[in-house]
Amino acid sequence: MATMSAETISSQPSAGDLSGWNERMGCEKKGVPMTTRKLARLAALALSTLALAAAAQHKEGASAPEVNYQAGTSPLADVAMYQSSNPKAPKMTQAEFDRARQIYFERCAGCHGVLRKGATGKPLTPDVTLPKGTDYLKVFIAYGSPAGMPNWQTSGEMSEADVDLMARYIQQDPPVPPEYGLADMKKTWKVVIPADQRPKKKMNNYNITNIFSTTLRDAGEIALIDGDTKEIISIIKTGYAVHISRMSASGRYLFVIGRDAKVNMIDLWMEKPDTVAEIRTGLEARSVESSKFKGFEDKYAIAGTYWPPQFVIMDGDTLEPLKIVSTRGNVVGTQEYHPEPRVASIVGSHFKPEFVVNVKETGKTLMVDYSNLNALKMTEIGSAPFLHDGGLDATKRYFMVAANNSNKISVFDLKDSKLAAIVDVGKIPHPGRGANFNHPKYGPVWATGHLGDETISLIGTDPKKHKQYAFKEVAKLKGPGGGALFIKSHPKSNHLYSDAPLNPDPKISQSVVVYDMKNLDKGYVTLPIAEWAGIKDDGAKRVVQPEFNKAGDEVWFSVWSAKDKISAMVVVDDKTLKLKKVIKDPRLITPTGHFNVYNTQHDVY
């Protein structure tokens, strides 16, 4: 966080205007004004709180897109947890504790961690919070900090009573969510259609290679959409807020995982594609993948969880859980023990029988050899903390993963199982899978956008023919603003597309930008995707995730609004950059991520 500037400090109340500040601070109790002395103390407390907060965080501060991204709801909000008794902490009833715990996991856990040990935000454990006291913490929660701590009360997100509740809650011992082991998983494991009773051949007339799997976030569903006819094939119940869709190596099975760690295995050969097996692998999750290496196609699936911090390898036909591995361990660099390092992205290697498992807080990438689960071998490679999402280069040999809060891209050689490079990029890189294309000067490059700034970083990926540019940031493209989540291209396209759904400016969040890859110097053109959708209500209409069809001549976008508003899918002609089709249907509730079967199966992006 930035230290407080003179301008910031001068914007705080002086002794002469404390009476007006009294009302703004909510410092009157039962209608009786506070004394000037008490109010002055509170003003000083507020100043010191904000100054300390500013000094404690990242140098440049957090942007609105970063805060929006980190503060997402956790499914742990609905999990019962034990309230321990700490005699030093302020008193809380069980009802107050349960309410505060729910608020914490809905608003705070994404930054401060499940156990309040700190993640991208600072620790909020009793050893830190008790010495500060309730009044100090109330000011901090209510008014936020210049570095990105939200102003929960003044923004209207929390009431004064909520702020008081949370100030007391973070002085309690952190409640620990239950572990989730093999017995728990097997209670949820269900084989809907046994493998030997499934179709022996494709039983439908769909071009399944051009089906799109679209997350219907708040409905707890996915939509399978025919990429040829633009018609919805089916709506399938899933876990909450499916984070990603991944394909089996054969292209037959679709795996999706919700934030609540429920995995669905969907058979695209069925007359009407549907779930054939399901399981819950934990309490919160983001990643699922299947085995890709020759000889192991479709043999295994893997899911990684945020809580408990672990991954599980499953049978590729039935999702039976076979092997659970914890990811708790020590942070790269500091070597401090971390009790909850979350499993972020997972990809299947095309060069070895390995899953590439990225562990967020410890900054470790695990090359997990699945050739013998009874004698499991893992190669642990450290790079930078806060590993998140990423994708393969065009040769599929190199895996590029964002260490988002470290502002770096870690590059791994999947053939030799080693770290190839760590590349400094912009603020909070968020590539999704990223985008591969041939630059006229630098040769093959991989691109990522950023949550925290307006740039797109291009990184060279060819150490043979363009060695001088390999695994370096060779260029930056300028976009309209931060808040980017996904960037995409296609081998048959001349265009590079980038969204910015978390940008606070609706003009930016409701559109996408497109670059001509043969003439990057001329900048971008803007496509008003939300406007093209023709939705007339007051929904947010955030435009999310460019995704090509199999042929590479269409680009699909989600137009995402709240569940009580109208959403849509918009299809654009890649060559002309003109509107081609708007898909509207009452069943398209909060569409966000969407994944083309062929491109996902073959890692084309």
Where on the chain are the PLM-derived regions?
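Electrostatic cytochrome c docking/interface patches
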Residues: 61, 65-103, 200
